[in-house]
Design a protein with these regions (language model features):
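Accessory RNA 3′-end/elbow-binding domains used by RNA modification enzymes
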Residues: 1-54, 58-76, 128, 145-150, ...
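Glycine/acidic-rich beta-strand-loop module
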Residues: 70, 74-103
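Short, glycine/charge-rich beta-strand/loop segments that flank catalytic centers
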Residues: 78-87, 107-109, 141-147
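Residue-level signal for inorganic ion chemistry
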Residues: 91, 112, 183, 263, ...
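Short, structured patches in soluble enzyme cores that scaffold and shape functional sites
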Residues: 95, 114-118, 159-162, 172-176, ...
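Acidic, low-complexity central loop/insert segments
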Residues: 96, 101-144, 164
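The conserved catalytic core of RNA pseudouridine synthases
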Residues: 146-177, 181-182, 186
Length: 334
């Protein structure tokens, strides 16, 4: 990694071209609930919080607090953070809980403080850390909840932010499931002095970043009480992102109004229901099925390429896995 500017690009940053199959297709404004028009209760039912996890509690404890605070039946988080680690923890609520699956291919970003066990010239630190970009082989730590099998993970970029003696502050963009503690251990071995992780903070989980949407638990308590006790929903609404935020990075297939109810009732997506698609979809890709109002209908696996979806007139294009939209948002038209 040269000392010039590092291109910080995760899979979530890939721009996709939209290919149109039916230019005349329209959507009925009377049907559905676009993200920006959902009533507050509904917004919460189909929402996801970009939560700033504090160091101390486990990710599961944080989610349990959110459930109790909002009196929810279900909630889930995207990517466990160890108790001592702080930062971006997407927490999906109620009907949106299963959408965290969509964050797996999006990539994550961390800022870590590595403490070296000996003096190393700065040029060597830069050169050695550069070698850890790309495919690496890792074994989960002893305390990990998963089996300790060797596995490959991708490091998209490493950017050194500051070197102060034996302390190296750096930013890393990585594939989901990459252990930063293990990465630092192996960097230390490669430098010939050893190293350990002193601090870690997650700064991105796919489309969720350290930006104006990031909220603390204290913020949530205040905003929730503003809404419930004073009737001021503005702050609480901004603290909860629509579930569609969690699929921003996924390739998408947009469908006509007449196909929505069939999918919400359990049907796979057939070609006649498609209006437009993202370019570059491959068979087996995880895709988001959307309405023409950009509402998330479902997640599924593509059984055709983008080209086949455009060219064919029949057949199943998406094997639907998880449905998020309620069955009564669009009428049955079959």
């Amino acid at each position: 990694m040269a000392r010039d500017e590092v291109r910080r690009i995760l899979p979530a940053d890939i721009k996709r071209e939209v290919l149109i199959k039916d230019e005349k297709a329209e959507t009925n404004p009377k049907w559905g609930f676009p993200p920006e028009k959902r009533p507050m209760e509904m917004h919460m039912q189909f929402g996801i919080i970009n939560l700033d996890k504090p160091p101390g509690p486990t990710s599961h404890e944080v989610v349990a607090w959110v459930k109790k605070l909002f009196n929810l039946n279900k909630a889930g988080h995207g990517g466990t953070l160890d108790p001592k680690v702080s930062g971006v923890l997407p927490v999906a609520l109620e009907r949106a809980t299963r959408v965290v699956q969509a964050l797996l291919p999006a990539g994550k970003e961390y800022v870590a403080l590595m403490h070296l066990h000996g003096e190393v010239p700065e040029d060597k630190i830069y050169a050695v850390m550069k070698e850890f970009e790309g495919e690496i082989i890792q074994r989960p730590p002893l305390r990990s909840a998963v089996k300790r099998r060797l596995r490959t993970r991708k490091v998209y970029y490493i950017e050194i932010l500051e070197i102060d003696g034996k302390d190296v502050l750096f930013r890393a963009g990585v594939e989901a499931g990459t252990y930063i503690r293990s990465l630092i251990h192996h960097i230390g071995l490669a430098l010939g002095v050893g190293a350990h992780m002193a601090e870690l903070r997650r700064t991105r989980s796919g489309p969720f970043k350290e930006d104006e949407t990031l909220v603390t638990l204290h913020d949530l308590v205040d905003y929730y009480h503003f809404w419930k006790e004073d009737g001021i929903e503005e702050y609480f609404r901004k603290a909860i992102q629509p579930m569609e935020k969690a699929v921003e990075h996924l390739p998408k297939v947009w469908i006509r109004d007449s196909a929505v109810a069939a999918v919400t009732h359990g049907a796979d997506l057939a070609v006649p229901g498609i209006v437009k698609v993202h370019k570059g979809i491959k068979k087996g890709d995880l895709v988001a099925v959307m309405t023409l109002k950009d509402e998330l209908v479902a997640l599924g696996k593509a059984t055709m390429t983008s080209g086949e979806m455009l060219q064919k007139s029949k057949g199943i294009a998406v094997d639907v896995d998880k449905v998020f939209m309620p069955r009564d948002w669009y009428p049955k038209l079959w």
